[in-house]
Amino acid sequence: MDYIQIGRVTVSRFILGSNPFSGFSHQSPDVDLLMRRYYTAAKIKEVIRAAERVGVNTLVARTDFHIMRLLLEYRDEGGGIQWFAQTCPEVGDHETCVERATMYGATACHIHGGVMDHLLAQRRLDEIPPVVERIRERGMLAGIAGHNPKVFEWAEQNLDVDYYMCSYYNSASRDERAEHVSGMEEWFRDGDRRIMTDLIQGLSRPVIHYKVMAAGRNNPEEAFAYVATVMRSGDAVCVGIYIKENPGMLEQDIRLLERGLLGCDGG
């Protein structure tokens, strides 16, 4: 496993995502429910342990009660994965989410991508600098996520953060509400992927690439080969896995990423 530095923190280049753990399939309400039924607390902890065994040291997950309780149990049982906390608009405001991240031992905290998209549309991005300052005051790395490239164009001019989380797909309208709603209309366009990855090349902060699989729609070999061509040396990729039908998905995804990166390095 390769590692990068984000601020003072060493981060595995493959980061474990948690949308499947929380039942966010971005496919349909039926698949959301299947994920929730499959991913019991015990099963989630099993997957995180497996990730740690192969060198993954970072989990991106929400500041909701389900995740926080699970991480508390996981650590009490000896787990050591570091938590990059994502704010959670449907269960609390910015300040509440930052305090939860602090209380439950997050290493970093970033603003939810849907929130950033929404605030951009509502012309309210001036709310964000004080939140970043609060995150830093609590001793965590600070970041933002987003699906709309314009979020990062704004951030480059107006925000001092430690990292960005850039979605390859601007897959839904967040103009009227920030949170994801199960069953909402979503789209995954190749053109959006290219626009975001072109933008990433000029960004001044480390980037965690996410939604690289288009929520399971992309062929894994193509997806990770593409990721390898656009990841910079200080970037990482965040991938959620749903292993019900493919128990070896974690190892497969890591292998595909490492093979792609090796090819890009001329190995």
What is each PLM-predicted segment?
Residues 1-76, 226:
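N-terminal binding-site loop/beta-alpha segment at the start of enzyme catalytic domains
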Residues 6, 10, 31, 43-49, ...:
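Structured C-terminal cap/extension of enzyme domains
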Residues 15, 58-60, 110, 165, ...:
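Conserved beta-strand positions in the central sheet of alpha/beta enzyme cores
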Residues 25-42, 83-93, 118-121, 213-219:
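Active-site mouth loops of central-metabolism enzymes
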Residues 63-78, 90-96, 115-132, 149-154, ...:
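Active-site-adjacent beta->alpha loops and helix N-cap segments on the catalytic face
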Residues 76-80, 103-108, 136-138, 157-165, ...:
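Glycine-enriched alpha-helix->loop->beta-strand junction motifs that scaffold or abut catalytic
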Residues 112-115, 163-173, 230-246:
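Glycine-rich phosphate-binding active-site loops on the catalytic face of alpha/beta enzymes
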Residues 155-187, 198:
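Histidine/lysine/aspartate-rich catalytic loop segments that bind and position anionic ligands
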